[in-house]
Regions:
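Terminal accessory carbohydrate-recognition/targeting modules of carbohydrate-active enzymes
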Residues: 1-273, 305, 312, 327, ...
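A short, charged helix-loop
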Residues: 422-440
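Inter-helical turn/loop segments and adjacent helix faces that build the functional surface
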Residues: 137-139, 143, 376-389, 458-475, ...
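Catalytic cores of carbohydrate-active enzymes
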Residues: 274, 281, 349, 402, ...
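Aromatic-rich carbohydrate-recognition surfaces in CAZymes
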Residues: 162-167, 174, 183, 235-237, ...
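Solvent-exposed loop and edge beta-strand segments that line ligand/cofactor-binding
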Residues: 115, 223-232, 297-314, 353-366, ...
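An acidic-aromatic substrate-binding cleft motif
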Residues: 253-299
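Non-catalytic C-terminal accessory modules of carbohydrate-active enzymes
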Residues: 74-101, 108-110, 489, 536-563, ...
Length: 710
């Protein structure tokens, strides 16, 4: 359990860098700092997903809370205004803990109250419960203990801010135990169920809130919030005050039952976690917060607070988020979700927040799709699902890659996968500022080739399972050609590692973390001696306590700090910034080249230790998106990132613990940390030497196209 006592809560700077997160399984969330002072425009008690998992609106920003003891008021809130923090409610915060959701314990003049905040799973609803816990027996018992609460509403897109305006409708619709507001036409209503003894309409604007995290990011950081009413509770009479803020009308009587149900639901996650390691159990609990609904199926939120569901992130995160803990139905649903959206051999890069057509500017999401499906099949043996719903899509993807699809993505005469157009970012190193693509990587990026080869090996295996001998031979041949070309073109003997990009001219010899995938993936193109040298080079130049740097510090383009406005930060995003998710493939590769030895596993476990301490910093219970490249490696970006959590879980269970799914007898090509056999007689023939023109007007399905003829 993560817990902070008074000394931490009263340290303003330390308290503000620790943020809690509640989610609802729809893409909505509630979040703030441990003292309730909002530092981001994304903070709020109800950030509703109006078009799950997107369309997120900050409806209820926060509550202004005042505890009254015999008429004397104690403000429990905290806000930052220009030049001042007011009030200073954290002075009364005795303790904060995650148990399993945020619980705040306040104490004033011997009176102790406990506040719990949690979201109701599957609803855009947040419950806030206050309980009178203790009265100091050393003093005369107070005659009156009350609580006044003023909701502060924003009603805006979660990427923006709002300001005082005349368009707001201040009306409050009242009925017994329910207060409803609809401040703007076209936006949802906010319904506040409560057990207050009094509701008083106020209609006040609170001006000039400042969000310091946004100021540091060079973004709009000032906002005005509206308070439509005040609620007064008598804690001496019922000892409990309850509010349920929701987009749907509901009663408050079930608040305690909702709390009990949420605790039970979350405990089931830990029961399914096959370890007693508290660090891994915490990550397993966190993993559930990234899995959300998209229609009738499931998807993955890439990161909180501002990411939606991205194809690449989802496929990378899927194995770690779902498979070691037995969430096979969810994994299958996620695979089905994205199979529906494959278009011209590509998976969506992202779904826009406002809805509409997905964006397809990614070369690797479709390739990670193969790897996610391979993992799913290895854990479940669900061959029927793969055969009926995924295999036809995979055949189509390979065909499009060979014949050519958007953005210059096409297999060239080397049998490797080339990609790239001017002004378009296609790999995971996708930062773009205006027309400036920071790391364009046009040509043949190293990890794309590793994924391409792995996809071909997976297809060879599947074709064999499905008794498609012709296809099996075809994929075997394509993989062999790619393997030969890769070793010829990508090995940098001078540095003893792999080039990052090959593109006709001088190869890009930057020492980047991308090369680790040529070792970590189950199907590797490298002989063991080269694989070992790659791992050693990555360890020497890129390994930090929190993950791998994206670029070696010795490089002239290296950025060790991640600060400033959007242009400055995007310029550093993949130019030295540390990515925790890369620790997963690094651990896989390290244990692999060391033959799965116990010593290697102990070393890998040691590399995970700093991240355990990190769970009590930044996004509590989660792993941040990135860290600065220079020590002490300040956490940055999203405070909770799906693939950061997922890859640590996957590497821990599969590599450190060795709990890999056992290869099935019917899968002759299932890798067992083995290395490619270079003794096979392979002809380095161009894989698509016999291209023919596409005749079909509808290019969304051409799995039998002659581009794939061997």
């Amino acid at each position: 359990m993560i817990q902070f006592k008074r000394e931490t809560c009263s340290d303003l700077e330390g308290a503000l860098r620790r943020e809690w997160l509640e989610t609802n399984g729809l893409g909505g969330f509630a979040s703030s700092t441990i003292i309730g002072l909002n530092t981001r425009r994304y903070h709020g008690l109800l950030v509703a997903a109006t078009k799950p998992p997107l369309g997120r609106l900050v409806l209820l920003s926060k509550l202004e809370e005042t505890l009254f003891i015999d008429g004397k008021g104690f403000d429990l809130s905290a806000n930052r205004y220009p030049g001042v923090v007011h009030p200073l409610g954290f002075r009364y915060l005795k303790k904060f803990r995650l148990a399993p959701f945020p619980v705040f314990t306040y104490e004033a003049e011997g009176i102790e109250i406990e506040k719990s905040v949690f979201m109701i799973h599957g609803e855009n609803s947040t419950a806030i419960l206050y309980v009178l816990k203790k009265e100091d027996n050393r003093r005369e018992s107070p005659k009156n203990v009350g609580l006044e609460i003023r909701p502060l509403i924003a009603f805006r897109d979660y990427h923006g801010t709002t300001h005082e305006n005349d368009a707001i409708n201040p009306e409050v619709q009242e009925r017994s135990g329910l207060a409803s507001v609809t401040p703007y036409e076209g936006l949802p209503s906010l319904h506040s169920a409560h057990n207050a003894i009094e509701l008083r309409k106020t209609g006040n604007w609170y001006r000039n809130f400042e969000y310091d995290a946004e100021r540091k990011r060079g973004l709009d950081f000032s906002e005005d919030l509206f308070s439509p009413f005040m609620l007064r509770f008598d804690l001496r009479f019922c000892r409990q005050a309850s509010i349920i803020a929701s987009t749907e009308p509901r009663g408050v009587a079930q608040a305690v039952e909702y709390r009990r149900a949420e605790i039970t639901r979350r405990r089931k996650t830990l029961v399914a976690c096959p370890t007693e390691d508290s660090f891994i159990q915490s990550l397993a609990a966190a993993s559930a917060q990234y899995i959300v609904s998209r229609g009738d199926d499931k998807t993955v939120i890439a990161g909180y607070h501002w990411f939606g569901d991205w194809g690449r992130d989802t496929m990378i995160a899927l194995p770690g988020l779902t498979l070691p803990t037995g969430k096979y139905e969810i994994a299958r649903s996620i695979l089905r979700t994205f199979a529906k959206h494959v278009n011209q051999g590509m998976l969506p890069n992202r779904f826009p927040d406002a809805g509409g057509t997905p964006e397809y500017n990614t070369v690797d999401a479709a390739l990670w799709f193969f790897e996610a499906a391979r993992s799913y099949l290895a854990y479940t043996g669900d061959l029927e699902f793969v055969r009926d719903e995924l295999y036809p899509v995979f055949v189509d993807i390979i065909s499009w890659q060979v014949c050519g699809t958007r953005y210059g993505i096409k297999v060239d005469d080397s049998g490797l996968l080339a990609s790239g157009e001017l002004g378009v970012q296609l790999t995971w190193m996708d930062a773009k500022v205006g027309d400036w693509v920071v790391t364009p990587r046009r040509g043949k990026p190293v990890e794309i080739q590793a994924l391409w080869y792995s996809a071909l090996c997976i297809m060879e295996d599947l074709a064999g399972r499905f008794a498609d001998e012709v296809a099996q031979k075809r994929y075997h041949h394509m993989a062999a050609v790619a393997q030969r070309s890769f070793n010829r073109l990508f090995w940098n003997e001078d540095l003893g590692c792999l080039h990052d990009v090959v593109n006709g001219g001088p190869p890009d010899a930057s020492i980047r973390s991308n090369q680790i995938f040529a070792v970590s993936l189950p199907h590797s193109m490298l002989p063991q001696d080269r694989a070992r040298r790659v791992v050693e080079k990555v360890e020497e130049h890129l390994l930090t306590p929190f993950g791998l740097r994206s670029l070696a510090p010795s490089d002239a383009q290296y950025h060790g700090c991640y600060t400033g406005g959007p242009a400055e930060r995007d310029g550093a995003y993949h130019q030295g910034t540390v990515w925790p998710w890369l620790l997963g493939p690094f651990i896989s590769a390290y244990i692999k080249v060391n033959g799965g030895s116990e010593q290697a596993k102990r070393q890998a476990q040691a590399w995970l230790s700093p991240l355990e301490s990190h769970l009590a910093d930044a996004g509590l219970g989660h792993v941040s998106e990135i860290f600065e490249g220079d020590a002490p490696h300040r956490p940055c970006g999203c405070v909770a990132q799906a693939w950061s959590v997922a890859e640590i879980l996957r590497a821990y269970f599969e590599d450190v613990r060795g709990l890999r799914p056992k290869p099935r007898a019917s899968s002759p090509n299932q890798s067992k940390n083995c290395w490619p056999d270079f003794s096979r007689s392979l002809r380095p023939e161009p894989v698509h030497q016999r291209h023919t023109a596409l005749r079909s007007k509808d290019r969304t399905r051409h799995s039998n196209n002659s581009c794939l003829d061997p």
